Amino acid sequence: MLVTCAIGGVALADPVTITDVAGRSVEVDAPVKTMILGEGRLIYAVAALEDGDPFARVVGWRDDLGKADPATYAVYQAKYPQIDAIPTFGGIKDGTFDIEQAITIGPDIVVMNLEAKGATEDAGLIEKLAAVGIPLVYIDFRDAPIANTTQSLEILGTLLDKEARAKELIDFRDSEIAKVTDRLREANPEKPLVFLERAAGYSEECCMSFGNENFGLMVEMAGGINMAKDIIPGTFGTVNPEQIIASDPDAVIVTGAEWDAYVPGGAWVGLGPNSDPEKAHEKLANLMKRPAFTGVKAAETNNVHGVWHQFYNSPYQFIVIQQMAKWLHPDLFADLDPEATFKELHARFLPVDYDEGYFVSLSED
């Protein structure tokens, strides 16, 4: 059971015990009025559950959204200019999270990504916050998103008093994933070998990828075989160029975003709302000129695609599962429209309009 109510009633804040994705039992007065987001990109989920201003309860957040996803930041900033005034924090993993600032703000809850658990424990953050009555919960859309997204949305639904809306989103997500997995199960098509390059062009080194989790698991759900699943033991890791050439993947899918804040003018593929399709296409094509892709089947046949990197860190993974399925099995999923699904997500759950720019493909040449 996710939540055990200590006192009845839902209109007022009551003590509830939440089991977070780390398996911790955390007592919280819910619904919360104020919260600090240990990562700014957690707003992807918060915005989908709040039926009003998604920043109304956010009294502090990590400064990553404007750097890692400036296009989305700009979309929300245009409608909610007050986000510029929200106090920002550094990351717990790099030691720049200001605990004293968090205590001074005094939120009802601090919400952290599961990947920060080790650093959070090393810093004694949970104990320091608990000493002043501030609970901390972990949610996860990155380390094991397929397994943890449902529970993470349920936790946020409880914290925000949006349980019904969270269930609606979970049901929508599940039904859209089933459109892919059910058809694949019935048709049982031959599965192409896929190389997933994480943040392609972010650095000159080649190549970051995914093990059997996150995008690595998503591509398997979409009817592909993740080339690196037996090479990378965890969620994230690297493969060398020789492994790519020797494996000769049928398809290549890279992740990309606007990363000028980190790597100005880099070779990365800028994807996200309102991205430049011609520029993204050109940069994707240039990435295939690297030695790691010399003579590789996917590059030779233009079976090369790019997706918005932040799908790996949001509850929107079902969109990219549909898009990858359509690329990998175009005939089987000829009637599937991932963009229409994304538009429906925006119309039903998000407070901003949908803008194109999340995908690019060389196969359209």
Predicted regions and their residues:
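N-terminal ligand-binding lobe of clamshell/alpha-beta domains
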Residues: L12-D365
